[in-house]
Amino acid sequence: MSYKVEESLIQDSNAAISYTGTWKVATSTKHSGGTCKYVSSAATATYKFTGTGIKLIASKSSDKGIAKVTIDSKVYYVDLYSASAKDQSVAFSLSGLTSGTHTIKVEWTGLKNNSSKGNAITLDAFEIN
């Protein structure tokens, strides 16, 4: 069986991303595609993709928290804190997945780095390999 591998940038506004909770939209030229979603309460963003790897593109800053990222039932915690603002950052990257269909879920945890002033998480885009 063979699979078509996607090589693309999936923007936060893509209808194939399933959102729960109250995500808000920040509009700016500093974001990939001109927008970035953010949330600071219970919420998830889920996307099914075909490929062997994925990157989470997000905004990092001094008021961001820790996101829970789940890929095919494996859990990773991603700290979006940065002392200075960093837009379009590769916040998380995973390669070496078996060729096929996978699911990524990004979830607000309420957790934060001790240096952070807040616990919001962001989603700017996914990059599929």
Where are the predicted features?
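Glycan-recognition surfaces in beta-rich domains, encompassing non-catalytic CBMs
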Residues: M1-N129
